[in-house]
Regions:
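Electrostatic cytochrome c docking/interface patches
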Residues: 29-59
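Bacterial N-terminal signal peptides
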Residues: 10-19
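Positively charged n-region of N-terminal signal peptides that target proteins for export
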Residues: 1-4
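C-terminal capping alpha-helices of c-type cytochrome domains
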Residues: 105-111, 118-138
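Electron-transfer interface patches adjacent to heme c in soluble/periplasmic c-type cytochromes
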Residues: 85-100, 116-126
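Periplasmic/extracellular electron-transfer cofactor-ligation site
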Residues: 31-34, 51, 61-84, 112-115, ...
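Sequence context surrounding c-type heme c attachment/ligation sites in exported
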Residues: 53-61, 80, 96-100, 110, ...
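Signal peptide cleavage region of secreted peptide precursors
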Residues: 20-27
C-alpha cells in the first residue's frame, strides 16, 4: 500500500514539474524586445502591392514558415524544438508594432530568432517580407 502511495506521489510531482517547466518556456519568451528609436520611426518605402506581397510570400516560405507557420501563428514544424515560444504574428499586440520594428527584428534577430541581414541582404526584400507579415493579419 505504501509503495503505491509513494509511486502516486512521485507521478503527481513529476506531472506538476513538467507543467511548471512547460509554462516556463512561455515565460522566457515574454521578455521585451527593445527596438532602437531609429527603427521604430522608420517608414516602409515599399508599397504593399501584389508584386511586393508575392516576393514577401516567397521569402516567408523560404526563411520564416518553418518556425512561424504558414499563417504566422507560431506553429511551424520547427517551433516546438525552440527554447522560446514563437509569437503569433497575427495578434494585435504584434501587429501594432511599426513596420520599422518588424524590419529591425527580422534583420537583427535575437535568441532563437536568427538575423536575416546576411541571408536577405537587400533591404527591399526585407520590406517585402514586412508587407507580407502585415498581410497575415487580414
Amino acid at each position: 500500500m505504501k509503495k503505491k502511495l509513494i509511486t502516486l506521489v512521485v507521478m503527481v510531482a513529476a506531472l506538476f514539474l513538467f507543467n511548471l517547466l512547460s509554462g516556463f518556456k512561455q515565460f522566457v519568451h515574454q521578455k521585451e524586445w527593445p527596438v532602437p528609436e531609429k527603427y521604430v520611426k522608420m517608414q516602409n518605402p515599399v508599397k504593399a502591392d501584389a508584386e511586393s506581397l508575392k516576393e514577401g510570400k516567397s521569402l516567408w516560405i523560404k526563411y520564416c514558415q518553418s518556425c512561424h507557420g504558414k499563417s504566422g501563428l507560431g506553429d511551424g514544424s520547427k517551433a516546438a524544438q525552440l527554447k522560446t515560444t514563437v509569437e503569433d504574428l497575427t495578434t494585435p499586440k504584434i501587429q501594432k508594432q511599426t513596420d520599422g520594428a518588424f524590419f529591425y527584428k527580422t534583420s537583427e534577430g535575437r535568441e532563437d530568432m536568427p538575423s536575416f541581414k546576411k541571408k536577405i541582404p537587400e533591404q527591399e526584400d526585407i520590406w517585402n517580407l514586412v508587407n507580407y507579415m502585415r498581410s497575415l493579419n487580414k
